[in-house]
Amino acid sequence: MSKLHDFLNEAGIFYLATADDDQPKVRPLGAHVEEDGKEYFTVGDFKEVYRQMVKNPRVEIVAFEPKTRRWLRYTGKVVFVDSPSVEEKIFQELPHLRQMYNDETGYKMKIFTLEDATAKILDMQGNVEELELK
């Protein structure tokens, strides 16, 4: 597992920042998986966050790990992917999502990763650790 993935797991909840025209929007997320060294996330196709990312794919994910008082900034460009293996992995790790994303509800899970990305772990003393991304 990558340091990025481990940090997101330790934090539990992370925050995804998008833009709605000139208005920043931030919301908590928790769904993520790693496959082949890349981190993948998911949102619903029926949500504003999805429409915002389609319109402006530049986003930032921030996670805070309270035990160490460090935080992660993961910034990049959203790229939506169609990956049955990643989708199945998400459903295995978060089975409750099957109740939301299925033929009966009509809702679709949109899986994305970040490209042209940077990731840093920072602390209150000003230390910055640049993470290597795949």
Language-model features: locations:
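A short mixed-secondary-structure module that forms the rim of ligand-binding clefts
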Residues: H32-T68
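Acidic-histidine catalytic/liganding microenvironments
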Residues: A11, N56, L94
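Hydrophobic/aromatic beta-strand elements that line small-molecule binding cavities or substrate pockets
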Residues: L29-H32, G76-V78
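Short glycine/serine/proline-enriched coil/turn segments at secondary-structure junctions
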Residues: Q23, T68-R70, L122
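Charged, gly/pro-rich active-site loop segments
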Residues: R73-K134
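A short, Trp-centered hydrophobic/proline-enriched beta-strand micro-motif
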Residues: D6-D21, V59-A63
